[in-house]
Swiss-Prot record:
Protein name (record): DNA integrity scanning protein DisA
MF terms (GO), sorted A to Z: adenylate cyclase activity; ATP binding; diadenylate cyclase activity; DNA binding
Signal peptide interval: none
Binding site for ATP: 73, 91, 104-108
Gene expressing this chain: disA
Pfam families tied to this protein: DAC (PF02457), DisA-linker (PF10635)
Catalyses which reaction(s): 2 ATP = 3',3'-c-di-AMP + 2 diphosphate
InterPro entries given in the database record: DisA, DisA_sf, DNA_integrity_DisA_N_sf, DNA_integrity_scan_DisA_link, DNA_integrity_scan_DisA_N, DNA_integrity_scanning_protein, RuvA_2-like
Organism from which the protein derives: Clostridium perfringens (strain SM101 / Type A)
Length: 354
């Protein structure tokens, strides 16, 4: 499970991504070049800041806020964005709240957002941009064409990184079946997996911001990454030191800086190998990752299998009778495991992706 970064910002972007009725209204105001100030919130704290204006209390529609924004004052919408409460209102936030904005709308929006921790949107009349504030967050919404271009570039980069990861993983697969994997091979595979996942995170941010215009990017992303994260977690589980919790190790690796991620010794240290030579240290996998590739074998059976034998090499050496002794594995399943591992070994020998 990936650590969630910028979760609050992602929630904000989801609310006003292309395809939503709020974004349609914002774009209408932007095209009309009238400018506007919109606050999303209907609690007492917001309503206490409202001075004057018209109490509309009408159902929200993009056309309504486009027309109402022609007046100078602010619009106040309910938090669920279903109703327009006030139009042409003057907002009176605490003037002592610091702001580095210059325009009146933007200064008011930032102060309201900081004071109430609600979303305030300022639409610039001259610069033709939409700026969103909430608490200490400030974000300028970008044009969909710009984001789409960045997302396509990121997809191309991801394709190259996935190709490298596949080569590294194929090499590790061969070595695992021969029980010749070194710490260097393992840390390289973990490093490459994390690099891929960081690009995936970036693309997911673009997809949220693109809204319904990001469907094709989303499909391309799903096609490229498939089970990469799951394989990466199982890889850590295969090789981390016995008393270490693999999910904690995964979180630590996610927290590494871009510079630290390039240092394989640091990744080895996170796995519990301190002061070991990467190239000279042979390591044996427990077998979670390879066993997960066997068709129609439930995860609880894989847990029992690895728990019983301890290492992949012992699972590979085991006969049907030995496999049959494991809880949850009968005669039929023992044959399925043996045949599954044999087919995986053949695929690996042919240098095919699992």
């Amino acid at each position: 499970m990936r650590t969630v970064h910028d979760d609050e910002l992602k929630k904000i972007l989801k609310i006003m991504s292309p395809g939503t009725s709020l974004r349609e209204g914002l774009d209408n105001i932007l095209r009309a070049k009238t400018g506007g100030l919109i606050v999303l919130g209907d609690n007492e704290e917001i309503l206490d800041l409202v001075d004057g204006g018209f109490n509309i209390n009408s159902e929200y529609s993009p056309a309504y806020i486009y027309e109402l924004a022609k007046m100078d004052g602010a619009l106040v919408l309910t938090s669920d964005r279903k109703r327009i409460l006030y139009a042409n209102a003057q907002l009176m936030p605490n003037q002592s709240i610091s702001t580095f904005e210059t325009g009146t709308r933007h200064r008011t929006a930032q102060r309201v957002a900081k004071q109430t921790n609600k979303i305030a949107i300022a639409i610039s009349q001259r610069r033709n941009i939409i700026t969103v504030y909430k608490g200490d967050i400030k974000y300028v919404l970008r044009d969909s064409a710009v984001i789409l271009s960045k997302a396509n570039q990121a997809i191309q980069t991801l394709e190259k990184y996935v190709a490298v990861l596949e080569r590294v993983t194929n090499n590790l697969n061969i070595l695992e079946f021969q029980d010749l994997a070194t710490l260097f091979d393992v840390t390289t595979a973990i490093q490459r997996t994390e690099m891929v996942m960081r690009i995936v995170e970036e693309i997911e941010g673009y997809i949220i911001e693109l809204g319904n215009e990001g469907r094709l990017i989303s499909m391309q992303l799903n096609e490229l990454v498939r089970s990469i994260e799951q394989d990466g977690v199982l890889l850590i589980r295969d090789y981390c030191y016995d008393k270490m919790e693999y999910n904690d190790v995964y979180k630590e690796i996610q927290e590494l800086s871009a510079e630290d991620l390039l240092d394989l010794d640091i990744i080895a240290k996170e796995l519990g190998y301190v002061g070991k030579s990467l190239i000279d240290t042979l390591v044996s996998p427990r077998g979670y990752r390879i066993s997960s590739k066997i068709p129609r074998i439930p995860s609880n059976v894989i847990e029992n299998l690895v728990g019983h034998f301890g290492k992949l090499k012992y699972i590979l050496e085991a006969g049907n009778e030995e496999l049959d002794q494991v809880e949850g594995i009968g005669e039929a399943r023992a044959r399925a495991i043996k045949n599954g591992l044999r087919r995986i070994r053949e695929q690996v020998a042919l240098n095919k992706n699992l």
